[in-house]
UniProtKB/Swiss-Prot annotation:
<protein>
    <recommendedName>
        <fullName>Uncharacterized protein YbjN</fullName>
    </recommendedName>
</protein>
<dbReference type="GO" id="GO:1900232">
    <property type="term" value="P:negative regulation of single-species biofilm formation on inanimate substrate"/>
</dbReference>
<dbReference type="GO" id="GO:1902201">
    <property type="term" value="P:negative regulation of bacterial-type flagellum-dependent cell motility"/>
</dbReference>
<dbReference type="GO" id="GO:0010212">
    <property type="term" value="P:response to ionizing radiation"/>
</dbReference>
<dbReference type="GO" id="GO:0030308">
    <property type="term" value="P:negative regulation of cell growth"/>
</dbReference>
<dbReference type="GO" id="GO:1902209">
    <property type="term" value="P:negative regulation of bacterial-type flagellum assembly"/>
</dbReference>
<dbReference type="Pfam" id="PF10722">
    <property type="entry name" value="YbjN"/>
</dbReference>
<dbReference type="GO" id="GO:0009297">
    <property type="term" value="P:pilus assembly"/>
</dbReference>
<dbReference type="InterPro" id="IPR019660">
    <property type="entry name" value="Put_sensory_transdc_reg_YbjN"/>
</dbReference>
Amino acid sequence: MTSLVVPGLDTLRQWLDDLGMSFFECDNCQALHLPHMQNFDGVFDAKIDLIDNTILFSAMAEVRPSAVLPLAADLSAINASSLTVKAFLDMQDDNLPKLVVCQSLSVMQGVTYEQFAWFVRQSEEQISMVILEANAHQLLLPTDDEGQNNVTENYFLH
């Protein structure tokens, strides 16, 4: 039987390595950033953080300023559609608004590697679905590649 572990950041690093997931740590926070999540259209940043014995998997996407009101109106439906994934808007004066989608796992009583692996996979899947749906409704800012394609398309249309 696998024993329960109350993981620290070192344990999370090892488990992510065991899962074959690349990550990096920045100088601004102690979170483990997941660059592969940026492959999903719209994802600006994704990370796993350990806060007060809770693992927090979160992803951020930049929101079109004109889409803040429609997205804010949809947040209740987004949050009601999942028991575990929660979304909110992060709006600060000096930055573009961001959609933050997160999922948490309490590890106060311990967690196994298998439970962590399942949590990470489920979080990736559910969080990416929320962001992909927001992107499909054109609520998010396009990535650099998408923005260049749209400029070209608009040029040919006019």
